[in-house]
């Protein structure tokens, strides 16, 4: 060139191409993903095709050297990082709680997809025998964790239920490693035909026992040691924040290195290492607000799919010499999209606990993207076939030509895999399935704090709740609108604690009222309730006019109410999210009859203002010990896992999840009858319980428009929740009890719900309330045993300071 400063190299051009694409796409990424519904993998692959050797030839990785070797190692690193990240982000002890669902997706569903693809490859591609077709099917059977991120993370994830996101994440992270047994079984059948003993010995002893089982154990050891090491370093304050956040990336590289050196399944090593590393949820809680992993994943995805788009074998997609034609590949792609997973998942839906409806089964069956994992499996298979033909290091730079043993298999495996990947990128990367699922889901985010949109700040709605301002005062909560479902002679009210019985008894008092007022309707209680409501409206109207000089707009309600309705300003205005959260929590509280201990209520603190010590629960006896602090942290995590976060409806059911995507309640409404149809409340860890028909209003709220408002106010000791039209959804009576009891301090998940209606939850509750939660006594024992092991690696200052940071 004229000037030596302008001389460029291939590497410099590659850096520029990847950098330009990443910069431009990052600037419009939200528009592309939200408005065009296109994922970054599709756009990056198209860009790689344009600048690659097939179009502009600016970016040509085929001229860098051994392309297969480069692609294999890049795919290995990307997969190990992504698989480790997926396992770390799962809820704590996820594999222990959901192993049935994960196993059903990994074993029967993968096996079915493998056999179906192999059958159609054998039919469509001439010249390939069935073992070779099994090898083709094994390469494109696994679900890719990189492409699955378009559903399990980001803005698209808000349209998918949390339990489905967790299930897809776990499956995509684990089945890439479990594709290795299918690959090597196919290789053994292809390389050792008619030698059953050799096939069984190699597959069981080498593939299953060494590569898979020992690889999983090795991953657990690496993850466990890494967890202990980072907790020790953090407890001694010898690790900085940057290294703390990057530590899991370092562990992922460690898994890739040791797995490759020992000849085990490095993807399984990475997955189980991440699972063991984040088993107790401590690391996830520490890095909850950090997005370092997401940033690194995005950069790697941009670069990888630009690279992949530039090396696609476009000429081989229509190459009759190796038995491939475009129409054959199109038919095979349709089989992969529609028959690989959907029939198996639909048929096994009753056996998968985490799939609650046929629509969810259809979504899980459809969303099985093929991507980086298929590239890794295809090049690994090709390398193994080449190793039986030469003593050179594999994979080879050039594929053996016609006449070599298994030459057609080695020539077809890469084009078939790449065509399947591009089809999956187009279908799954566009996220059409996610958008369609979101149209049928009516979701509502549950918040634990009031919105604070009251217009009369002088009379906060906390002040209008029952006067339970004495700390430690017991109370009972009873639903007044609940239809009687108990047999005569049983107690009619279900309370949260001690039953408050009047001196004369409820029936005697009622008979006395009937005798004294025979000409008056028997619903005296409701008349008093209406009088109290009218008095609130009257007083609020006066206070509103005095303080603001304005009235609310005419809402046009019925039921004989005033047209202006200025009394609304005194009520607490809540949206439908908070209404669902309040009703859900208070119904659960009112129906709890197994716990006979009395709760203590404290309404001295304004709701919405959290104390930095709210998440720290201490015992009076051993509050300063390290073991107690660790147990308190675990109890705090368990409490957070029981807080309702989102509810959504699907067909005739309401599913309530926590922030981690775990299902708290599963409410199914049977539509067989009109008014007397019974409802069932199902929980995957609890037996079936009956609920009253008024709970169907929860189903109604979640299906309403998001702009609807609801009102919560107090009339005497009654807590009322109603909508804009005046329909009362719930009435609760909070009955204070006499006397006090000393109760050991513990926690209950209904605290956040009580806080949302102005009642600060008891600082004390019997520990037997934990039996009501999803966790069993065995899990609690495991948590406590695990906390005792972690005590040895922490000093008295470290855990306390870290726990305080977590509480903040």
Curated annotation (Swiss-Prot):
The keyword Ion transport applies. Keywords: Antiport, Glycoprotein, Ion transport, Membrane, Sodium, Sodium transport, Transmembrane, Transmembrane helix, Transport. InterPro entries: Cation/H_antiporter_C, Cation/H_exchanger_TM, Na+/H+_antiporter_fungi, Na+/solute_symporter_sf, Nha1. The chain crosses the membrane at residues 12-32, 36-56, 70-90, 105-125, 128-148, 174-194, 203-223, 244-264, 267-287, 294-314, 319-339, 361-381, 409-429, 432-452. GO terms for cellular component: plasma membrane. It is a multi-pass membrane protein. It is found in: Membrane. Residues 542-561 have a biased composition (Polar residues). GO terms for biological process: intracellular potassium ion homeostasis; proton export across plasma membrane; regulation of membrane potential; sodium ion export across plasma membrane. Residues 478-499, 541-562, 774-808 are annotated as: Disordered. This is Na(+)/H(+) antiporter 2.
């Amino acid at each position: 060139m004229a000037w030596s400063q302008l001389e460029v190299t291939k590497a410099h051009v590659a850096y520029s191409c990847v950098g330009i694409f990443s910069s431009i796409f990052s600037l419009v990424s939200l528009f592309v993903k939200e408005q065009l519904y296109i994922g970054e993998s599709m756009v990056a692959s198209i860009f790689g095709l344009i600048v690659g050797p097939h179009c502009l030839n600016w970016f040509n990785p085929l001229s860098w050297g051994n392309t297969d070797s480069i692609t294999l190692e890049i795919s290995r690193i990307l997969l190990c990082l992504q698989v480790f990240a997926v396992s770390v982000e799962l809820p704590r002890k996820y594999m222990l709680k959901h192993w049935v669902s994960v196993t059903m997706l990994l074993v029967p569903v993968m096996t079915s997809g493998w056999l179906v693809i192999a059958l159609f490859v054998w039919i469509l591609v001439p010249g390939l025998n069935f073992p070779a077709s099994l090898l083709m099917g094994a390469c494109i059977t696994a679900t890719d964790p990189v492409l699955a991120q378009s559903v399990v993370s980001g803005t698209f994830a808000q349209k998918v239920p949390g339990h489905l996101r967790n299930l897809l994440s776990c499956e995509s992270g684990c089945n890439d490693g479990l594709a290795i047994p299918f690959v090597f079984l196919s290789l053994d059948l292809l390389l050792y035909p008619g030698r059953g003993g050799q096939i069984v010995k190699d597959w069981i002893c080498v593939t299953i026992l060494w590569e898979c089982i020992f690889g999983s154990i090795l991953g657990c050891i690496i993850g466990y040691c890494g967890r202990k090491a980072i907790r020790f370093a953090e407890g001694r304050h010898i690790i900085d924040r940057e290294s703390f956040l990057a530590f899991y990336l370092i562990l992922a590289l460690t898994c890739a290195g040791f797995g490759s050196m020992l000849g085990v399944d490095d993807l399984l090593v990475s997955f189980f290492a991440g699972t063991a590393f984040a088993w107790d949820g401590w690391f996830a809680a520490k890095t909850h607000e950090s997005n370092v992993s997401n940033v690194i994943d995005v950069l790697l995805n941009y670069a990888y799919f630009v690279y992949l788009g530039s090396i696609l074998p476009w000429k081989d997609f229509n190459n009759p010499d190796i038995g491939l034609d475009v129409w054959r590949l199109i038919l095979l792609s349709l089989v992969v999209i529609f028959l690989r997973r959907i029939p198996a998942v639909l048929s096994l839906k009753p056996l998968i606990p985490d799939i609650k409806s046929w629509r969810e089964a259809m979504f899980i069956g459809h969303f099985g993207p093929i991507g980086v994992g298929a590239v890794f499996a295809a090049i690994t298979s090709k390398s193994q076939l080449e190793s039986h033909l030469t003593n050179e290091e594999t994979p080879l730079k050039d594929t053996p030509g016609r006449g070599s043993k298994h030459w057609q298999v080695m020539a077809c495996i890469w084009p078939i895999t790449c065509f399947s990947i591009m089809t999956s990128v187009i279908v799954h990367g566009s996220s059409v399935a996610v958008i369609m699922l979101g149209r049928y889901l009516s979701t509502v985010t549950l918040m634990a704090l009031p919105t604070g949109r009251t217009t009369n700040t002088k009379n906060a709605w906390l002040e209008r709740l029952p006067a339970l301002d004495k700390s430690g005062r017991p109370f009972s909560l009873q639903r007044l609108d609940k239809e009687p479902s108990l047999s005569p002679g049983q107690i009619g009210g279900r309370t949260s604690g001690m039953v408050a019985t009047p001196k004369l008894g409820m029936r005697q008092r009622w008979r006395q009222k009937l005798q004294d007022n025979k000409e008056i309707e028997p619903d005296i209680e409701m008349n008093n309730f209406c009088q109290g409501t009218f008095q609130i409206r009257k007083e609020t109207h006066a206070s509103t006019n005095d303080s603001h000089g304005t009235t609310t707009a005419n809402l046009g309600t019925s039921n004989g109410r005033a047209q202006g309705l200025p009394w609304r300003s005194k009520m607490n205005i809540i949206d439908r999210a908070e209404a669902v959260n309040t009703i859900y929590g208070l119904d659960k509280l009112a129906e709890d009859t197994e716990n006979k201990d009395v709760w203590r209520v404290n309404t001295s603190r304004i709701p919405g203002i959290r104390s930095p010590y709210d998440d720290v629960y201490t015992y009076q006896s051993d509050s300063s010990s390290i073991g107690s602090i660790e147990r308190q942290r675990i109890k705090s995590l368990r409490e957070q896992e029981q807080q309702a976060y989102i509810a959504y409806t699907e067909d005739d059911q309401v599913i309530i999840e926590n922030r981690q995507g775990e299902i708290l309640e599963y409410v199914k409404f049977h539509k067989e009858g009109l008014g007397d149809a019974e409802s069932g409340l199902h929980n995957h860890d609890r037996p079936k319980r009956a609920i009253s028909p008024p709970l169907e209003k929860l189903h109604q709220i979640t299906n309403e428009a998001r702009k609807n408002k609801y009102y919560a106010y107090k009339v005497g000791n009654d807590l009322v929740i109603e909508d804009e039209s005046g329909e009362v959804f719930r009435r609760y009576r909070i009955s204070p009890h006499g006397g006090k009891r000393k109760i050991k301090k513990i926690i209950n998940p209904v605290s956040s719900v009580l806080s949302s209606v102005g009642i600060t939850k008891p600082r004390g509750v019997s520990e037997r309330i934990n039996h009501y939660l999803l966790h069993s006594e065995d899990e609690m024992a495991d948590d406590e045993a695990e906390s005792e092991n972690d005590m040895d690696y922490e000093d008295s200052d470290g855990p306390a300071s870290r726990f305080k940071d977590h509480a903040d």
